[in-house]
Swiss-Prot record:
Organism taxonomic ancestry: Eukaryota, Fungi, Dikarya, Ascomycota, Saccharomycotina
Gene Ontology MF annotations: D-arabinitol 2-dehydrogenase activity
Pathway: Carbohydrate metabolism; D-arabinitol metabolism
SUPFAM superfamilies for this protein: NAD(P)-binding Rossmann-fold domains (SSF51735)
Active-site residues, Swiss-Prot/TrEMBL: S170 (proton donor), Y185 (proton acceptor), K189 (lowers pka of active site tyr)
Gene: ARD
Name listed for the protein in its UniProt record: D-arabinitol 2-dehydrogenase [ribulose-forming]
Length: 282
């Protein structure tokens, strides 16, 4: 590369545009995906939302499109992308494979970005944790992360395409949030973080990047309901965060766009990006 090309604007300044790319988001009707899907649409992507409840996911898709039509009118050179809704249990490997294949066929292209926000937490003292519950949370949070990554990567490898996988971990994957009794959730998220590292090493030769985004406390609608009327709980949680507040969902958008962009994060793989307001620094 000659000197003039190396120092050109397009070569030095990363682009966060996702024009024409198909992005699959699991947990598609959740609070985090609501803001992320809007940001991705604004960057030119087509989006496929996946969740267990098809009706809620379809409504989420309609909401994203309506937002795009209202907020992006006259601000976007390209037409607004497509947004589709799908129902799938990510803990079911066969269902995941069929759904991802149907998504690619529906949109007429192979998805090149996967954001796995699906998963859940629950509280049980370790000595009382029901075996059935323990198995299910590992199936959804752990195996589900693998199943969606596998189904996403296969057509990319077959078509010699690059891609980016973003698995949502948690600060609970590296620390224990006292006093919450969530041993199986913690175990599942620790597994997600190491799964991303393992897949990053295996799929680097295919130019498929795999990273984890690990949030701290997020003020999703679910979290707001949990702390509503429990001022002492909110105060206790925030007292353990150096920034002394919980995160708004929009504060994760920049990290998602960075990891999704082939230009911005082309040499970033196997990384666990922690966005927790400094919680883990104590």
């Amino acid at each position: 590369m000659d000197s003039s090309s190396y120092w050109s604007y397009d070569n030095i300044v990363p682009s966060f545009r996702l024009d024409g790319k198909l992005v699959i988001i699991t947990g598609g009707s959740g609070g985090l995906s609501a803001v992320v899907s809007r940001a991705l649409l604004a960057k030119g992507a087509d989006i496929a939302l996946i969740d267990m409840n098809l009706e809620r996911t379809q409504q989420a898709a309609r909401d994203v499109l309506q937002w795009g039509e209202e907020q992006m009118k006259g601000k976007h050179e390209s037409p607004i992308g497509q947004v589709s809704a799908w129902s799938c249990n990510i803990g079911d490997a066969e269902a995941v494979e069929l759904t991802f294949k149907a998504i690619n066929e529906h949109h007429g292209k192979v998805a090149s970005v996967l954001i796995n926000t699906a998963g859940y937490a629950e509280n049980f003292p370790a000595e009382e944790y029901p075996a059935k519950n323990a198995e299910n949370i590992m199936k959804v949070n752990g195996l589900g992360s693998f199943y969606v990554s596998q189904a996403f990567a296969r057509p990319l490898i077959q078509n010699n395409m690059t891609g980016s996988i973003i698995l949502i971990g948690s600060m609970s994957g590296t620390i224990v949030n006292d006093p919450q009794p969530q041993c199986m959730y913690n175990m599942s998220k620790a597994g997600v973080i190491h799964l991303a590292r393992s897949l990053a090493c295996e799929w680097a030769k295919y130019n498929i990047r795999v990273n984890t985004l690990s949030p701290g406390y997020i003020l999703t609608p679910l979290t707001r309901n949990v702390i509503s009327g429990h001022t002492e709980m909110k105060t206790e949680w925030e007292s353990k965060i150096p920034m002394k507040r919980m995160a708004e969902p929009k504060e994760f958008v920049g990290s998602i766009l960075y990891l999704a962009s082939d230009s911005a994060s082309s040499y970033t793989t196997g990384h666990n990006l922690v966005v927790d307001g400094g919680y883990e620094c104590w």
